[in-house]
């Protein structure tokens, strides 16, 4: 049963909708960031359902927004960057250095670029089917951020 679950959402989407295989290496870093933004948001919302429980949706949304904003993603990549393989670091740097035609509303250019790199990495890992690695990196970032916050308060 576990294997059929990890057959995964991506495969189910492709099979049911009749989509072709996508090679993440052939996608632009901004396209990787586009899908990475969504998958990171989904992982964080799933995490919050467990850690915050059944609460008002607007409160859950505030918690999620605080974690998925560019500044937090920039902090998270700073935490996990030493854990990245050379290939993962290359994807992150491609995303960070990509020329974006949009700008952050509430973040510095530096944070926005680092967040774009983080999202590109998440998108790459997701499309490669490396879900466990993606979630391990997110967990490492969340654990460290939570320890820092706990020490402050």
What are these model-derived regions, one by one?
Residues 1-153:
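Double-stranded RNA-binding/processing signature
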